[in-house]
Design a protein with these regions (language model features):
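N-terminal strand-loop element at the rim of the active site
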Residues: 2-40
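Acidic donor-binding loop of glycosyltransferase active sites
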Residues: 58, 237-252, 265
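Short His-centered aromatic/hydrophobic patch
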Residues: 62-69
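A short, active-site helix/loop in glycosyltransferases that binds the activated sugar's phosphate group
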Residues: 109-151
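A conserved mid-protein helix/loop that constitutes part of the nucleotide-sugar donor-binding site
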Residues: 169-192, 204-210, 295, 329, ...
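Nucleotide-activated donor-binding/catalytic signature segment of Leloir-type glycosyltransferases, i.e.
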Residues: 207-230
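Short hydrophobic beta-strand element within catalytic cores of glycosyltransferases
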Residues: 262, 266-270
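Conserved acidic donor-binding segment of nucleotide-sugar-dependent glycosyltransferases
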Residues: 281-294, 302-309
């Protein structure tokens, strides 16, 4: 409806079929031969494939961090109007980050616009503050299409019933179990929480968290494992609140907070200077607590469990905030306007 035709270029270890039709546009895939530090690297055919697509496009839209895209950006075909969405600083790979710095500086400097996903990240990212001019730097929040209304879940298939949570309040943690998610703090907070905590997802920290629960002798932490899309929405619709206790800036935004807001659920997140505190407003849509502070985290969870009226009011305001700032349509209109602004008329 906005009159923009899109093509997406990406890498995959198994890039067959090479082209996929999606609602957003055609997805074109080349082979990823290696992924050091979670950075997929392509071969000569990737450069050829990108060259063809870049020559077709009027505007190139890059995403950061992906160092292979910096290599694509030096190709002659990339000398076009271009923008970059800056998702996150490089947090963990500091040594590699120093080696990558000159190429990163060149890439950021070559962009007509660099988009931070929240005002907080634009203000607190040292890279954005040092390497991106005020004229280049824009803010467009990430958005998400509304997943509601959803079909009712049959009782026989209910994950809430299967986990034994039908008649009790619970706090939901949803997503991949990664080191920066602060889930060890959430488990520690469970010692002081008057309700059940559900960890829905799988990932590298699974065994560490299970061992921590066993070591502490906790009976109010439930591991749901990886859940389906329908199960995810059932858990979101039935939980008291969503907790995202990420303690490192690798959690640059927190899309799961938007999913909770869609379901009119309050949120609990940590003050880490990123987009999480832009989505979740302290004392309005939920609570923002200090990172790595299990007592404060437990206090916030207990307050929402004990006060259903406050929890529902915060959840209602979270839904309103989603509708005002974070829908997919709002994001699309913002990027369409940006593309127009960098394109010669």
């Amino acid at each position: 409806p906005l009159g923009i035709e899109s093509a997406v270029f990406t890498l995959s270890p198994s890039p067959l079929p090479a082209s996929l039709s999606r609602a957003e546009g055609m997805v074109h895939r080349s082979r990823s031969y290696w992924a050091p530090a979670s950075c997929d690297l392509g071969g000569p055919e990737a450069f050829r494939h990108f060259d063809q697509l870049a020559r077709w496009a009027d505007v190139l839209h890059f995403h950061f961090p992906w160092p292979f895209a910096d290599l694509l950006n030096v190709m002659p075909a990339a000398r076009k109007p271009k923008v970059m969405t800056y998702h996150s600083d490089i947090v963990k790979q500091r040594v590699l980050g120093r080696l990558y710095y000159p190429l990163m500086r060149h890439t950021l400097g070559s962009m007509d616009a660099v988009v931070a996903t929240s005002p907080a990240y634009a203000q607190t990212s040292p890279v954005l503050q040092q390497l991106v001019s005020a004229e280049q730097l824009k803010v467009i929040p990430l958005g998400m299409n509304d997943a509601l209304p959803l079909a009712a879940v049959d009782g026989a298939e209910s994950i809430v019933a299967r986990l034994g949570l039908t008649d009790q309040p619970f706090i939901l943690s949803l997503g991949v179990l990664r080191y920066y998610k602060g889930l060890h703090v959430l488990v520690e907070a469970a010692r002081h929480t008057r309700g059940t905590i559900v960890l829905a997802g799988s990932g590298p920290e699974d065994q560490n968290l299970r061992q921590q629960v066993a070591r502490l002798g906790l009976d109010n932490v439930v591991f749901a494992g990886q859940v389906s899309e329908a199960e995810k929405h059932e858990l979101l619709s039935r939980c008291t609140a969503l907790a995202l206790p990420s303690h490192l800036r690798s959690e640059a935004y927190g899309m799961v907070l938007l999913e909770a807001a869609m379901h009119s659920k309050p949120q609990i997140s940590c003050d880490i200077g990123t987009g999480t505190s832009f989505i979740n407003q302290h004392l309005d849509t939920g609570f923002v607590v200090p990172p790595e502070d299990p007592e404060s985290l437990a206090a916030a969870m207990n307050r929402l469990i004990a006060d259903d009226v406050e929890a529902q009011a915060m959840g209602h305001r979270a839904r309103q905030r989603y509708e005002q700032h974070f829908t997919g349509a709002i994001m699309a209109r913002s990027y369409a306007a940006l593309y127009q602004s960098v394109t010669p008329h």
